[in-house]
Regions:
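Glycine/small-residue-rich phosphate/adenosyl-binding loop
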Residues: 42, 58-67
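A short, polar/charged loop-to-alpha-helix boundary motif
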Residues: 50-60
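Helix-adjacent hinge/juxtasegments
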Residues: 63-96, 100
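Short beta->alpha transition motifs characteristic of CBS
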Residues: 41-48
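Short beta-strand scaffold segments in enzyme catalytic cores
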Residues: 29-38
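Short, flexible loop/turn motifs enriched in small residues
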Residues: 24-28
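Zinc-dependent deaminase
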Residues: 1-21, 92-160
Length: 160
């Protein structure tokens, strides 16, 4: 497990990826995968616009990770994501074999921001609840209130 300062640094890397996602015409979400030595080994943008609504950054990253790395390796990896994974993304991270997930802002907070926007109809199903239904543990850390303003700045004007 990394320190709070390291977690924040990796979350900031995910924020940079979310900015790239917006620049590419997609939704403002991004994530990175960090191995147990603290190296970023993958990053993923959202590609909602080009992947039929299922191209969430976290699910994309989990699928890439499952193809590129062995499951034992992935148990030592942590996904850092700007916003708490939805139930689809949490399930994908679980099945990929990731060991931990760290998020900056809760899905509930995102829902407050997006309201009933048709491209982001959030569900009230925290990732901790999804992971707790599994047969193996996935460590979850978040939210990081000290990064909320920085994360939500990327969303400014996007959902209106």
């Amino acid at each position: 497990m990394f320190s709070k300062e390291q977690d924040q640094a990796f979350l900031r890397a995910a924020i940079e990826v979310s900015r790239k996602s917006v620049a590419n015409g997609n939704h403002p979400f991004g994530c990175v995968l960090v191995n147990e030595t603290g190296k970023i080994v993958l990053e993923s943008q959202n590609n909602y616009k080009t992947d039929s609504r299922l191209g969430h950054a976290e699910a994309n990253l989990a699928r890439m990770a499952a193809v590129q790395f062995e499951e034992n390796y992935l148990r030592g990896c942590t996904m850092y994501t700007t916003v708490e994974p939805c139930c689809m993304c949490a399930g994908t991270a679980y099945w990929a074999g990731l060991g931990a997930v760290v998020f900056g802002v809760t899905e509930a907070r995102l829902g407050e921001l997006t309201g009933s926007h048709p491209e982001n109809l959030t569900m009230d199903l925290p990732c901790r609840t999804v992971f707790s239904a599994g047969r193996r543990q996935v460590e979850v850390r978040g939210p990081f209130s000290e990064l909320e303003t920085e994360i939500l700045k990327v969303h400014e004007g996007f959902w209106t």
